[in-house]
């Protein structure tokens, strides 16, 4: 079983953030890829359609820029594993190609004081014509 396709989330300040499970231990406990404090309430989640949500996000960014010429992307490796599990890797790669994404797989991203998993972080470069 791959935990990449079944993330749990924690609610912080009204927003939900993934806390990805690394593996199940022999004693029944779980090891996470990022910090989970004692007593934190975790909620089972269901991921959005990876391809559709990526396409929608890139379209929103491209529209705001007047077109995206290039995206430097940092894509959590767990998203790649999830795409493989759901047989969406090729379709997701097509979206990345359509929006000029180049970059790296990562082991999560830093957002403020939080280490996040199963996220895509990027820098989009484009330009509006005047």
PLM region spans:
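Small-residue-enriched flexible segments
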Residues: 1-99, 106-130
């Amino acid at each position: 079983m791959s935990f990449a396709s079944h993330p749990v989330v924690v609610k912080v300040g009204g927003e939900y953030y993934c806390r990805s499970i690394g593996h199940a231990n022999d004693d029944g406990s779980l090891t996470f890829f990022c910090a989970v404090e004692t007593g934190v309430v975790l909620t089972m989640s269901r991921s959005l359609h990876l391809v559709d949500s990526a396409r929608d996000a890139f379209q929103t960014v491209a529209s705001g820029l007047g077109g995206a010429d290039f995206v430097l992307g940092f894509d959590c490796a767990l998203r790649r594993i999830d795409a493989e599990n759901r047989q969406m890797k090729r379709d997701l790669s097509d979206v990345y190609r359509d929006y000029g994404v180049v970059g790296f797989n990562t082991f999560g991203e830093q957002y403020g004081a939080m280490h996040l998993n199963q996220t895509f972080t990027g820098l989009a470069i484009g330009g509006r014509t005047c």
